[in-house]
Swiss-Prot record:
It comes from the Bacteria. It comes from Paracidovorax citrulli (strain AAC00-1) (Acidovorax citrulli). It catalyses: a quinone + NADH + 5 H(+)(in) = a quinol + NAD(+) + 4 H(+)(out). Belongs to the complex I subunit 4L family. The gene is nuoK. The keyword Cell inner membrane applies. GO terms for cellular component: NADH dehydrogenase complex; plasma membrane. This is NADH-quinone oxidoreductase subunit K.
């Protein structure tokens, strides 16, 4: 059995749905929310690579590198904000994020 485009798109859709469920079920822990958003971006990247391979075009794979770069910067900024929140409030709950207003 060979892996077709439908297999990769189904896996990408399952990963995307899992991340959406993770976002809706967990509203308090910001680290889990950040991981769910990253999983969502990886699901989108998988679809880009699958379509790029299926169509024989490299543009989708190049676009994935740009998305991964932005996702890495987003993760670094998000984790820096979480460290700041933990230092100030000793918790990483989403409700405490409003108290960082200066």
């Amino acid at each position: 059995m060979t892996l077709t485009l439908g297999h990769f798109l189904s896996l990408g859709a399952m990963l995307f749905a899992l991340s959406v469920i993770g976002i809706f079920l967990n509203r308090k822990n910001l680290i889990v929310l950040l991981m769910a958003i990253e999983l969502m971006l990886l699901a989108v990247n998988m679809n880009f690579v699958a379509f790029s391979h299926y169509l024989g075009d490299m543009h989708g794979q190049v676009f994935v590198f740009f998305i991964l770069t932005v996702a890495a910067a987003e993760s670094a900024i998000g984790l820096a904000i979480l460290v700041l929140l933990f230092r100030n409030k000793s918790s990483i709950d989403a409700e405490d994020l409003n108290t960082l207003k200066g």
